[in-house]
Amino acid sequence: MANLYNAEGYFSPTEHEAFTRIEKEERAAAKAAAFRPIVYICSPYAGDVERNTENARRYSRFAVEQHCVPITPHIYFTQFMNDNIPDERDIAIFMNWVLMSKCAELWVFGTIISKGMQAEIDRAKRKHMRIRYFTEEMEECK
């Protein structure tokens, strides 16, 4: 903490002000470094489920490496819900929307946009979310 008096004991408001600003900037930088936005991972699931699940894991890991918290519902919900049962799929889609509402951004991976992905993209647009597009190799499309 900055002291109002210098090392020799004299009143030094300028020095105090400078050190106070430096400390404030250091606290802000530390807080910013600790912040990790939540991002919704949008990628194919149906079709080649095994390959698409592995890709979703890679995309989630990529988000972590980019200092984000990934939300990848098609990895999580498929552990206890059956995508082939229409009622369960509808419930899962609803839960996807709930999770998406907590996210700062939607990250879309790959060149093939499935029907489910398009629904997620459309919803993100309606909610004015930032949408970022990436290749399967995790390079951002500009």
Map each language-model feature to its residues.
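Catalytic phosphate/metal-binding cores of nucleic-acid and nucleotide-processing enzymes, i.e., regions
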Residues: 1-142
